Each structure stands twice: as structure tokens, then as C-alpha cells.
From Swiss-Prot:
One of its GO terms (biological process) is proteolysis. One of its GO terms (cellular component) is extracellular region. Expressed by the venom gland. The lineage of its organism: Eukaryota, Metazoa, Chordata, Craniata, Vertebrata. It is found in: Secreted. This is Snake venom serine protease jerdonase. It comes from the Eukaryota. It comes from Protobothrops jerdonii (Jerdon's pitviper).
Length: 21
């Protein structure tokens, strides 16, 4: 995930959660 959770949360909410955790 490149660009931050705000950029990809729409496409990868589950991955964003793991990366942001």
C-alpha cells in the first residue's frame, strides 16, 4: 500500500487495516 491509508482505503480497506495496525 503506497500513498497512505487515505488513498487506498477505498480499494483495500482490509490491507490498509493491517498496514495501519
Amino acid at each position: 500500500i503506497i500513498g497512505g491509508d487515505e488513498c487506498n482505503i477505498n480499494e483495500h480497506p482490509f490491507l490498509v487495516a493491517l498496514y495501519d495496525a
